[in-house]
Amino acid sequence: MAIRKFKPYTPGTRQRVVTDFSEITSAKPERSLIVSKHRVKGRNNRGVITCRHRGGGHKRQYRLVDFRRDKRNINAKVAAIHYDPHRNARLALLFYEDGEKRYIIAPAGVKVGQNVISGESVPIEDGNAMPLSVMPLGSSVHCVELYAGRGAQMVRSAGASAQVMAKEGDYVALKLPSTEVRLVRKECYATLGEVGNSEIRNTSLGKAGRRRWLGRRPQVRGSVMNPCDHPHGGGEGKAPIGRAGPVTPWGKPALGLKTRKKNKPSNKLVVRRRRRISKRSRGGRDS
């Protein structure tokens, strides 16, 4: 997989950088694995906006992805690599020996015709799913379960992978993409290898309209709004916030306040917290 740059024929193509989609082998999804999905546009069950700047965009059909990998010890053949409009990662269409078809997150390097399998005594190969207890130390894994049997909940985005650091008792220590080291039960399943389409981080949409196609609406700073729209709004010209610190549109402290509960039960499973990202690495001054 590679990325494509365009000649500056228009302002939109001047900055546009996209993936070349060379790994996509079929344009049409598997009919039995797609369902329609109501788009909530950032609203909750009461119709109140809880996530701003969402709405519009091209219509989508949801692909049913197998995050559990619960067909144990049954060989599956990778029949195709498909595009998924709901995520940056690609999907691999599996044909099982018993005739069932399923989608999984496509690992990096997976090829059409390759066989994958899930179980406790399976080969140590990329794309195979197995419990963390049998994975070699130093292995790169993705689609990690937090609770056995619940399905993969971590490390699912394009190019992501976690590393098996240590095994002790009933737990396995994983170094997550955020650099956090967390303990996970050894019976939880994960898939060997990293998620494919890692070049997505080097792409650029090129124009605002392309972002609208993805269902993202324009973002506006609170300081240029009216007081009725945002706590930062109002004043003459470029007025300061007028508060001790920045807040969210709902008046809660923002930018730096820790929101994780101090007494959360899973705190004991976090061996090392994630590295703090300085303002220098985000393009601003170091804090």
From Swiss-Prot:
Record GO cellular component, one term: large ribosomal subunit
Keywords: Ribonucleoprotein, Ribosomal protein, RNA-binding, rRNA-binding
Molecular function via GO: rRNA binding; structural constituent of ribosome; transferase activity
Presence of keyword Nucleotidyltransferase: no
Keyword Repressor: no
Region entry Disordered, spans: 221-287
Composition bias, Basic residues: 258-287
GO biological process: translation
PROSITE patterns according to UniProt: RIBOSOMAL_L2
Database matches in NCBIfam families: rplB_bact
Matches recorded under HAMAP family: Ribosomal_uL2_B
Subunit structure: Part of the 50S ribosomal subunit. Forms a bridge to the 30S subunit in the 70S ribosome.
Functional summary from the UniProt entry: One of the primary rRNA binding proteins. Required for association of the 30S and 50S subunits to form the 70S ribosome, for tRNA binding and peptide bond formation. It has been suggested to have peptidyltransferase activity; this is somewhat controversial. Makes several contacts with the 16S rRNA in the 70S ribosome.
Protein family: Belongs to the universal ribosomal protein uL2 family.
Record protein name field: Large ribosomal subunit protein uL2
Organism (species): Prochlorococcus marinus (strain MIT 9312)
